[in-house]
Amino acid sequence: MMFTSNMIYLTAVVLKKDSDAVTKALLQLGVLDFVRVSELSGGNDARIRSVQASVSSARIIENKRRIEMTMGSGSSGVFQEVLPTLDDLQDLNLDDIEKKLAEIASRSQEIKEEQRLIQQEILKFEDIIRQLSMYGSSKSITAQGLRKSSEYSFLTIQTGTMPSAFVSQFENDLKVYPSVSMITGTSQDRSSMLVISLKKDEKQILQLLDASGWIQGEIPMASSPDQNVKENALSDIQNQIRILKEQQSSLHNQYQAFIDDRLEWFQTSWSLLRSNELFYRIQSFFSATDRTVLFSGWLPAEFKTSLEAVLYQAAQKRCFLEWHEPGEITAETKGRVAVPVQLKNPGFLKPFEMLVKNFSLPEYGSIDPTPFVAVFYLMMFGFMFGDSGHGLVLVLLGFLGKFVFRKSSDSSKKLSVLIIYCGLSAVVTGALFGSYFGYPLFPPLWFNYHAIIAGHSSEYTGIQSIYDILLITIYFGIAVLGTGLLLNWINLIRKGNWMKLLFDKAGIVGGWMYGAGVYTGFYFVRHLYKALPGQTFLLIGFGIPSLLLLGKEPVLLILERKGGHKEQKISIIFFLNMLMEWIVELLEVFSGYLANTLSFMRVAGLGIAHVSLMIAFFQMAHMADGPGGESSVWSYLILLAGNILVIALEGLSAGIQSLRLNYYEFFSKYFNGSGRAYSPVSIRTRL
Amino acid sequence: MIVTSSIKRYAFINAKLKTRLSLVLGDEVFIRLIKSQNLGEAMLLLKETSFASVEAVYARTGDLKMSELELMRAEMALYQEIHRFGDKDLQEFVNALLMQYEIENFKNVFRLWFDRWIRKRDISYASGYILREPVLYTYDKDAVLAAGEDSLLLESLKGTAFVDVVKNNMDEIRTAQTLFPLEMALDLLFYNNLLRQCQKLTDKDRDIVLRLVGVEIDLENITRIIRFKLFYQFSPLQMQKYIIAGGHRLKPDKLFALYSSSGEAELLPALLGSGYGSVSALASQSQTDIYKRMEMVESILEEILKREVKKLLLGDPFSIGIMMSYFIIKKHDIHRLISILNGKNYGLPEDRMKS
């Protein structure tokens, strides 16, 4: 947990006939982060060649993607990954899968085509509506007027009579065309009718009418003087459009049901493809001679015994395994083959591990900053967002997020847990400051933040003004930077980089000057900005380390000469360079540390802003109180809106600023983010 | 003062657009779209992109043309959004850019009118694919489609910039039964209006816009000239009628001279050589198939525009350059998407869609 996991390097040789069994064993255990053998040798060993996969990986992946996509179009709306097992690793027949996928695609297109045809019917009906809408006001128009106006539109309107007995059959036959038919009156055994259709269907409609005993003629005015034909027609068309849209929707549901019915096949095929993809991915790292197969890779040292056991078992002990320490490999390959980095933290620290990885991975063998980030991040957040009520809201939001994202990616879940932690931190600091949604419900356990900002007594003698709050954050900053320096020294000692340990800005000399600077700063303030520490202190605190920094280049030169490296000539240029570098480094040390430390005042700044905003909303709510000073609905609403705004704005600001202080102030002291992530191939690897 | 106003004008808009650029479809998505087995699969790929609404329309209707309409709406929404955030001068300029969609939609409406009244075809369902909501002008598209007589047609276009263009071309439309001159005149209307609006911008912005619009005009002119030469065999004088003024490097007199003096094979290298020497080497690749040659021309011109856009994106963050680049990139994305989706719909081979 303190450092990145110890890695070990395996080089293995197995018989070709055992390679499939070995691949399965490697896939099942899933701990090896493969490195091609050619990378070790520099790629120029003619005796070994790559193993050619019998199936195209690209084809496997393409089919897998097609399945994911098609599954996602079912009723669930998303593809849900179910991890395959070794039992899924069967013989793969890509032709069969592609054939089945083509069948599914073809049927899907048939359904889409049906939807498209219905869509065109809808468009035609909508067109009829538009045409009808052009015929004056809906209240005044009559069948005669409608018929007369139709000569300029795409519509054709027939008026006349037909035997009442034929109406039902006619209306049934008419359904294949976008049209409207309406009975406007009945006299004896004949019905007066109005038929609206598109001009392009006129011929067919006339044929239908002829077959139904149609007699063309005006609708008798007496039978429908006030009949609102247009309104009725529009209503009828709307109804037909609604029916068509329902049919379209039903086809969409039919499509989703069609996909859902095949979920089992999709899932089985996906697992088959995924397991084969991983199987061939492992084999793509293999190199071969005529009778043997070679592979190599990194694994956490703790898995050495278990991997050894499964390999011996899979190869029936007909294999040769060689283990190497990371140092040997990096030296042999001159750093070409990097040691992968695995951070190993308990589950509750995973959200903070995510924050570290988001920045970068630490160098192999160095300190894993996760636990430190967890502590500092939460302290900073709590100080900036110190309100138990607001913290509780964050806790609830975090739990809600966990529920909502229960099927989503890991990072969404970790973010939800991080919000819960931040909320808990705010609950604790809120209790310390006695703030519950801005109200002092309980006495503060430490000091009353609100009272200080409002200019009242803080109920704690140690902290009485904003300056005291700022001072706390400066102390905190010094602690964070001091921790960073300490971690840097540990990293450098482990690496045996003594020069850097001594001379680096974040090395002992840098730390020495920072310590002296901190003491001098406080001394200066304590003496009301009028006195500095004695000359002896200044000489020891700043003079000696400054001179040591000046000596850095000559020491390096001597070491280079001793190490037999190319000699740098000692010339006036060398001395000028040395001087310039020294001045720049001194400036960097003084200005850099000062800026780093003062940067932590933002923690107080954000905290003050949080409290100030709440005070402002309380005052606004008070202004909205009733005439007798009683709370009104408006004052409650203002308080509610204020709290929501503060939680949203300040929560985001505090989260970002805490992250910023960790990344740019804390990490800059010791973190070398050059690590490559440990990435083993496993049957349990998620997409 | 100028600096302050340009920061005020562009800080928010450009920050927003720069973020949006991350949502632009990458080449990888286009390759996967091209490789998808059919239109349905291609649409499903869009589900996880910023074009999810297009897939939703297709899932509901199964109709590619309805999805295209959605794409056009999405494209216009980009301009309308910037319009909301811009000040008055910028809004006027954005309107000038939006004019291209108004014109595009009017062309669609007029093509239907032409089909119905000149070619006497049925347009009942096709009229469902025109955009009815107003873009810049409020006019009744259905009244246009229903107008059988010229007077009614012009009456239905009252209040738009299209009245004069239609009036001037009506005789040729009826006699020659072609929309070609009308559509060319509408393109001219767009570019002239855009160049006029440019004059209201600050010097820095005007230079950027003139350069970019000038490049677009150059590319449009090159495409036209090549088509005139290859497909229509226009005389230089006929060609001259349809040339857009305002090009960045290729002025009308130079185009006229090159058109008059070059044969089919030499025209493209000559045009590129005169204005865009850095890509003229691409034009030397011989293509015998006339369509392949046009595809090659289009890809070369696209490359030219890409280079210009890249320069602008790396330039001043508080200028109109970012906005123009964003519009061009998105327009390019949408047009490429439409081409691929149509290619899938008609079962075109992959290599035809790559161009």
Predicted regions and their residues:
Chain B
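N-terminal domain-start signal
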Residues: M1-S355
